[in-house]
Amino acid sequence: MDLPEELLPLSWLLGQWVGVGTGQYPTIEDFRFGQELSFTCDGRPFIAMNSRSWILDDEGNRVRPSAMESAFFRPRPDNQFEALFAHPTGFTEVWYGRVTIADIQDARITRASLEMTTDSVMRTESAKEYIGGQRLYGLVSDGDLAWTFDMSAMGEPLSNHLAAKLQPA
């Protein structure tokens, strides 16, 4: 199936990714997590993302489920994108961002980044306070996917919460 032309700037995200990351925030203890992340396109002009993660012990074994999220990335003009994220913990987000292509070799994107900022957050009555965040996804020179998530939540200012480096599955 051909990828719609307007999604080509995000084509480097497509596929299955697995790896390990770290988490921290002023209101919790630091932790390590394992993650499975997939980006897919069924031919329509959006990319679907599904992520699930687990808390890991010191030996790298799964201790318990950690987080899940689903998202849809939709193109806008000039390498800009909007994304809709949903979380089972009771909130949804609208994100806006821009893709930067840093290197192309043999007609393939080999280094790129997607920077995004929340535009709005909607949460259920029972969800924890979460104001907004920033995300950065990057295809780094070794072909891995690195990403970070900074958030403002539970009365704390914007600060790093998650970072991971994932390899193609």
List where the protein language model places each region.
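Acidic, glycine-rich flexible loop segments
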Residues: 90-91, 109-134
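Short hydrophobic/aromatic-rich beta-strand segments that constitute the beta-sheet cores
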Residues: 19, 48-51, 80-85, 114-118, ...
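Helix-adjacent hinge/juxtasegments
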Residues: 58-101
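Hydrophobic/aromatic beta-strand elements that line small-molecule binding cavities or substrate pockets
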Residues: 34-40, 69-74, 94-103, 132-139, ...
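A generic structural signal for short beta-strands and their flanking turns/coil linkers
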Residues: 13, 33-35, 43-47, 67-71, ...
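Amphipathic/hydrophobic helical signal segments and adjacent flexible N-terminal regions
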Residues: 1-46, 54-65, 142, 150-169
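Short, solvent-exposed aromatic-acidic interface loops
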Residues: 52-57, 86-92, 121-122, 150-155
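Surface-exposed, gly/pro-biased binding rims or lids
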Residues: 123-153
